[in-house]
Amino acid sequence: MQRRFILKLAATLGAASLFAAATVAHAEDTIKVGVTGGPHAQIMEVVKTVAAKNGLNIRIIEFSDYVQPNAALASGDLDANSYQHDPYLQAQVKDRGYKLIRIADTVTYPMGIYSKKVKTLAELQPGAKIAVPNDPTNGGRALLLLQKQGLLKLRPDAGLKATPLDIVDNPKKLKIVELDAAQIPRSLNDVDAAAINTNFAMEAGLKPKQDAIAIEDPKGPYVNIIAIREADKNKPWVAKLVAAYHSPEVKQFVESKFGGSVITAW
C-alpha cells in the first residue's frame, strides 16, 4: 500500500515537473513584438508565420505612435520592436536613457511629400503651410527633404536632427507646421503640403510611388531596424527573430505587396 502511494506520488511529481518545464519552455519561446500600424504590422504577420515554423511564437502588439513602443520595450512590456529607423532609436537612447540596441536592419520607407492642393512643389505659393513630424529625427528628416527639393536651406551643421530654427534661407516664406507624425495624413486638407513617413502614408491609403509629389532617396541613413533590450542580446530567440525577418518569404512578401514603396534592407 505504502509502496503504491510512493509510486503514485512520484508519478504525480514527475508529471508536474514536466508540465512546469514545458510551461517555462513555452514562455521562453514566446515573445511580444511592438509595431506601428500599416506595413510594419503587415510584415510582422509574415515574420510571425515563418518564426512559428522554427519554434518561436510571436505576439504582435500594435501601437499608434512612435513614443510608446520604445517605452514599452524599455519597461519590459515588450521583448522587441520593429517600427523605427536607427537615428530615431539613437536619439531615444540618448534623450531617455533607454538601454536598447539595434539587432538587425529591416526595410526602408522613403519619406514623401504629399498635397491635395498642388501637383508639384513649384506650385506652392509664398506663405504655404508645410506639415512636418514634430519629433527631432523625423522632423529633421523632413526638413532635409525640403532642402533637397530646393525649398529652403538649413545651417550646414544642422545634421539629422535639424529643426525649423536651423532654417537660414526660406525664399517662399514657407510656414513649417510641426505635428505628430501619425496625425499628419489627416492634416492634408488643412495644409498646402506635408512630409509624411511612408508607413503612416500607406496606412492612410496613400500610394507613395503614385501620390507623392517628391520622395526621399532610399539610400540614406533611415533604414528601419529591430530593437531589443541590451540585456537580451544573447537570448536564443534573438537569432530566430532575425532569421525569420530576413527570410525569403518576407522578402518576397515585401516586394510583391508594396511595389517598391517599401524596400528590403538586407
Region spans (language model):
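Short helix-initiation/N-cap motifs at beta->coil->alpha
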Residues: I60-A71, A158-R186
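Periplasmic-binding protein-like
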Residues: D105-Y114, N138-Q147, M202-W266
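Beta->alpha turn/N-cap motifs
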Residues: G38, E62-Y66, G76, N81-Q90, ...
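Short, well-ordered beta-strand elements
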Residues: E28-G38, L56-E62, K129-I130
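A conserved helix-loop-strand patch within extracytoplasmic ligand-binding domains
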Residues: I103-L152
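Pocket-flanking alpha-helical
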Residues: Y66-G97, G112-Y114, K119, G139-A142, ...
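Ligand-binding "clamshell"
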Residues: A91-I103, K116-V118, D190, A195, ...
